[in-house]
């Protein structure tokens, strides 16, 4: 959503399966570009950060909203230089009927992330946080050696 909340977003985006809010049904907010696009003026304010990747100088972090999944429904793996996050739950009833959900996310790890020090946690409000420290560029992240002056 780099262009802001006023630009139409794809219907099948990260909010798929979330249900509609009242402002989604107002004609003022409907898009005239295509039936597969819609404007969601306030959703980015209400639900920002659904999937956020940060690569700071010292740390690499992925934050992913998985509130519809229990810990048993989630799988987090490192395969080669990628983090793979998979979630799936069977059909269950919610406010709008019956729904089943499944997602698969794959993120490339920066080369300088120390894979042996990666942590992953799930908060009570359903936010999955995956993070790992970065090693200085003159060090190999797979080794714990460092030059001593």
From Swiss-Prot:
UniProt keyword terms in alphabetical order: Cytoplasm, Eye lens protein, Metal-binding, Nucleus, Zinc
Main location: cytoplasm
GO molecular function, one term: structural constituent of eye lens
Residue numbers binding Zn(2+) 1: 89, 91
Protein name, as recorded: Alpha-crystallin A chain
Keyword Metal-binding: yes
Binding annotation for Zn(2+) 3: 143
Source species of the chain: Anas platyrhynchos
Recorded coiled-coil stretches: none
Domain sHSP: 41-149
Gene that produces this protein: CRYAA
Pfam families, sorted: Crystallin, HSP20
């Amino acid at each position: 959503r780099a262009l802001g909340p006023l630009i139409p977003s794809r219907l099948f985006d990260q909010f798929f399966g979330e249900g509609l809010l009242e402002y989604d049904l107002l004609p003022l907010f409907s898009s005239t570009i295509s039936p597969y696009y819609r404007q969601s003026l306030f959703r980015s304010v209400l639900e920002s950060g659904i999937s956020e990747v940060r690569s700071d100088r010292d740390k690499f972090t992925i934050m992913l909203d998985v509130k519809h999944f229990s810990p048993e429904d989630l799988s987090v793996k490192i395969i080669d230089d990628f983090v793979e996050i998979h979630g799936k739950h069977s059909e269950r009833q919610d406010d709008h009927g019956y729904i089943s959900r499944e997602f698969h996310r794959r993120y490339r790890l920066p080369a300088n992330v120390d894979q042996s020090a990666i942590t992953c946690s799930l908060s009570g409000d359903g936010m999955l946080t995956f993070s790992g420290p970065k090693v200085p560029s003159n060090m190999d992240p797979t080794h714990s050696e460092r030059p001593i002056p």
